Amino acid sequence: MPHPQIVADNAPSLTAVLFGLSGCLVDFGSTAHANTVPAAETLATPGALNILQWLNTQGTPCAWLDELPCAVTTPLAAALPGWVHGCRPATAPWPAPHACWQALMELNIAHLDGCVLVSGEPRLLQSGLNAGLWTIGLASCGSLCGLSPGQWQALDEQAREHKRAKATVALYGLGVHSVIDHLGELGTCLADIGLRRLKGEKP
């Protein structure tokens, strides 16, 4: 049997990774609204900057998507590296696939193979599924739990596990390909998708 690391090294590289903005890269609990941006929510979520840095070293194009107006997304995205592309809202709202396709076109991506969407927002994940992308749902970080980092940490372990499990079931119910807790776990998940692609699996 091949060594897992050898298999992972032979896995095809990623073509592009799309992220939700609010409730994924920033705004842990997806609490920003059309007219309000809580100051704490402009901070990058756990693991976000590290995984973006890693993807950049791999030469993987990345972009974020959101349906909030520019007056909200601009301050939200301020904590992110400048090379991460911010996409204009698509004319067709989620869960239509147009936003994902538009984002890939803005990144000059010519094909869907190896393209991944990461989000904690069910409607955006549905958009990714409809677009033919690999999709990774975030259980604790996003609108399904809807808690700020402080509120999340204030819960006891049993309450956190209950919310996490409920969100995980809901995400798999959408049909997503993988579910992780937060972006700190994304590297391992992307490696797993690489192995699945190596075996011929399609999204």
Q: Where do the protein language model's features map onto the residues?
A:
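Asp-based, Mg2+/Mn2+-dependent phosphohydrolase catalytic module
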Residues: M1-T31, V37-L43, L49, Q53-T60, ...
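Nucleotide-state-sensitive switch-loop elements of NTP-binding domains
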Residues: C62-W64
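Conserved phosphate-coupling serine/threonine residues in phosphotransfer and NTP-handling enzymes
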Residues: D66-L68
